[in-house]
Design a protein with these regions (language model features):
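RNA-contacting regions in translation and RNA-metabolism proteins
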Residues: 1-48, 61-83
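Glycine-centered tight-turn and secondary-structure capping sites
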Residues: 52-56
């Protein structure tokens, strides 16, 4: 990966780009609020279903990855998937 391989934003971006058909439209914005970092994930409308997954399983897995990265970093991370 890159020299920032421990960065949750880079991890989330990398994993999401591997899931979607239009990786050039994936963007991740990190916002600090109330002692936690919220990552806002934006993808192409046609890829939204792939990112959410059946019954929300893929979205749940992405949130678990962020949670694990948060534990490792000693911080709280949250994920919002924007339409």
């Amino acid at each position: 990966m890159s020299e920032q391989s421990g960065d949750p934003k880079v991890l989330l971006e990398h994993v999401t780009k591997a899931l979607v058909d239009t990786p050039d439209q994936v963007s991740v914005e990190a916002i600090e609020e109330d002692g936690e970092t919220v990552y806002e994930l934006t993808v192409a409308e046609s890829d939204l279903g792939k990112v959410i997954g059946k019954s929300g399983r893929t979205a749940r897995a992405l949130r678990m990855l962020l949670s694990a990265a948060g534990v490792k970093a000693g911080k709280r991370f949250a994920l919002e998937i924007l339409e």
